[in-house]
């Protein structure tokens, strides 16, 4: 039989094995302060941990200003050599907006597991295709696997949390060029 290992959070700041910016306790405390916490509270500990880890991976898929504080740190934050609102980023903590982004993205991912990858099988992009008189009918309520290029397309509100830190804003598929 296949045994599934429970997801474990490692939120060590600058940790070489870190997989999350926040602990489950921090996430649960955050959701005690929002108008509707039921969409988080109704998840198991394992579902919450998996969502937090997945959210971290997506947050780390972007390119950010500044530099990682330690070469060996697993995650993109903390960072230094950059300011937000005139305040230098600190190597001792994760910026609050990064944490907020992770909380909200984790909740979104936990409640819509197909949001990024799309659906599969009969629910793909095309519902019908003909060759004679060439006719294509598209599914409008479905998005095929791999059709999302940018998590910001699905969750544009992430820009309000991450935008000040991101190189290139919401379309952060840019490459930093260093001329020397």
Region locations from a protein language model:
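Divalent metal-cofactor coordination and adjacent catalytic microenvironments
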Residues: 2-180
């Amino acid at each position: 039989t296949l045994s599934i290992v429970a997801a474990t959070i490692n939120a060590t700041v600058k940790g070489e094995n870190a997989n999350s910016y926040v602990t489950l306790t921090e996430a649960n405390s955050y959701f005690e302060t929002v108008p509707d916490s039921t969409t988080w509270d109704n998840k198991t500990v394992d579902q919450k941990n998996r969502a937090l880890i997945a959210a971290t991976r997506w947050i780390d898929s972007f390119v950010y200003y500044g530099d990682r504080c330690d070469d060996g740190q697993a995650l993109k934050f903390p960072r230094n050599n950059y300011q937000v609102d005139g305040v230098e980023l600190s190597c001792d903590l994760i910026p609050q907006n990064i944490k907020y982004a992770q909380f909200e993205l984790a909740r979104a991912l936990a409640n819509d597991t197909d949001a990024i990858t799309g659906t599969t099988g009969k629910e793909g992009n095309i519902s019908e295709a003909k060759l004679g008189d060439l006719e294509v009918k598209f599914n409008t309520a479905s998005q095929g696997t791999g059709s999302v290029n940018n998590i910001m397309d699905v969750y544009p509100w992430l820009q309000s949390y991450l935008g000040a830190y991101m190189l290139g804003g919401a379309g952060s598929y840019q490459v930093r060029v260093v001329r020397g």
